[in-house]
């Protein structure tokens, strides 16, 4: 279900839902109710003191994010009572009707005491884009995962093993006004993500403002012990409790009405997919080696270092970002499919995550990055029809994308555009090397250049150590290293390493042209040259792309060649890029100097057969083929749900193609959480779609792997 912005009215200057005729917070004591119902209702002050914060993170789940009040109150408690703690807070919330940025900013003026938190939320707040949005708050001490969409569907897509919850804030509009949310399916989904513990403080707790019988019975049916408690203010009662068991409770003979609770909607049986197993959450490694210092490697290094993990970054060249990440400007945008897909969701949520990193590191300065928007032009009738279908099928807000005429496109671009198209106002461009330099400027990250890796071997730990685990031995031109875990992020060069030789990666040659342009005229200049007259204000994209001028150069391209492997600049590729630019912006193309004055950058994109990135645990190829061999003859063979044969503590991030700026950072956050055993920023269908073993399974089903 696609999220839609909330429709609000503002009695007394406070937000109220026009759709549900209900308030977002108590206008008289807007934080006291949260502290009573949710903070104290989950017994969090005592639980944090007596053991919950002994672990390296606390996970809280919420229904109904609203204005974020509950999160702010919890952050205030932690900052007040546990300011020196190194543990992190993971706050998982859902919202089907998110406030617009303007409405949220208005609503948050009611919380001046939380200004330090509210500004961070506003800086990172996305439009109404379906999916999981990961926020980095308080310098990485808090991670908000905001699922925009239906609460039940959002929770059902999460892995209980990797997204378990310690405390539930069951909030939202009252059951009488929003019965669709408070359903048996919601309670079943909440139960899946809950856990028991012999030490009561460590078991999953819950609290809620409502005393509705449907809520009480629904939670009891799903394994929660429920009790009434004193409510806040004029509300006499509330409910709270803790998780007891995953199986449904036995028939209650003393109170038989408890058994009349509606049952969750039966789900169609799902074929087991044990081959998409993820490693069980484990203790964070002390030292991780990352092979490759492009976008994938540097973003992963930062995500791990932010969590206190020491990282050694190995680069075979003499500096970072020399290969596909080496362009001066890379377009930061999502080219969406006609129908909603996992690929489209990854691109949209990935774009928003990259924007958060750019803002946190203050890179949106017009030199290292710029959120200037992007025009995707309909340069053919077929593309025009595709764009119309996209708008009709995706129901995205105009804050994400809107249709524009040729005249509107020309005004936005500041040059003549002969095509209609789509305008993506949140898109922009990034200098990948500048982004990577900012990310790896961290005391826990060590960069080693001229370190081409030649061997990657799994070795037993030395005799006398306290663990029986194995460690990775990495041999490079700079010597030998050992590590608790390894992330391979060196694109198609990964195939040169023995454990990864079967990866289906393909290099795609691309040449980006750069043409010198005259410096832009200042506001005081009397004359406007043809160059400044057609200076781009936004990125234009059709069969190629062109970015606004930076450092008196116009960067545009790029060729797409699956067959040529030369890294030499080819004059005919300049001609191709000029022809492509002429179709998109003829006046701009005419203003450029001859191609003999141009320069170029040749790189090789690393792509996969399905053009989705590879991100996740590395499979043991031979063991996979052996274990799942029956898929050759029966794709529905009922395999046991046992862990898949993975390479221990070996992870991959590659195959990002031309979309690395929007996929590599989010994949890095995913890998960092997977490696450290922390809650994941993506749901199970997405991690399945990124899983490195997916091609082995597809080829077995097609019987394309030799016996």
Regions found by a protein language model. Name each.
Residues 115, 338-339, 365-376, 400, ...:
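Helix-loop-beta segment of a Rossmann-like dinucleotide-binding subdomain
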Residues 183-202:
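A short glycine-rich, Lys/Arg-flanked "PGG" loop and its adjoining helix->strand segment in the class I
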Residues 422-461, 468-477, 481, 485, ...:
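Helical element adjacent to the flavin cofactor pocket in flavoenzyme catalytic cores
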Residues 51-163, 184:
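The AdoMet/dcAdoMet-binding core of the Class I SAM-like
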Residues 426, 591-707:
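C-terminal catalytic lobe of FAD-dependent flavoproteins
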Residues 207, 339-350, 377-384, 421-438, ...:
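Short beta-strand to alpha-helix junction loop
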Residues 256-283, 289-291, 295-307, 316, ...:
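Active-site substrate-recognition segment that forms the wall
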Residues 329-412:
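Dinucleotide-binding Rossmann-like beta1-alpha1 core, especially the glycine-rich loop
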